[in-house]
Amino acid sequence: MKEKENFEKTDHYAKETQFYIKLLPFIDESTDDYFFIWDVKKRRVYFTARITKQYPLEEEENGYTLKQWLSIVHPCDKRMLLEELNKIKQGQKDTQDLNYRLIDRMGKNVWISCRGNIIADTKHKNPIMIGRICENVFSLWEDELTGLMNASKMAMDFEKKPLEQTG
């Protein structure tokens, strides 16, 4: 009897995940952002094919592994991202709100804002994150020629954490 219950739960989980994945193309048409589904249990991230035009990923029907996703994350940001994903995977967090860099098809660093929320069953056994990646957030903060943060971004950083006086 328990085996049948587990099968039904697994089947429901798979159907629910597929439902969200099928919604992606419809939502994707209405925005410049990239919406994603992260199946935490299966360790796969799903995007529409549109992301492959900007980033060096091959179109995958069955989603991307975390290894594939990390291949386009800037090396300096990988550790931070992995720490965040592990907290989510362990159930310590149910949201993600990170800013990090991806490397596009031209080899250019692109600052992104990545936000998502976990949808899970009551026991947090089958977590699925639904979220979005936005590139436009940082376009006002970055010098297009050098890729360095500009004075507006520096002023925002100083407002958050003023320089400590040394003496």
Give the predicted meaning of each segment.
Residues W38, R101-G107, A120:
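PAS-family sensory domains
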Residues L148-G167:
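Short regulatory alpha-helical coupling segments
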Residues C114-G131:
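Short loop/turn elements at sensory-signaling interfaces that couple input to output
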Residues D28-Y34, R79, K87-L98:
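PAS/PAS-like sensory domains
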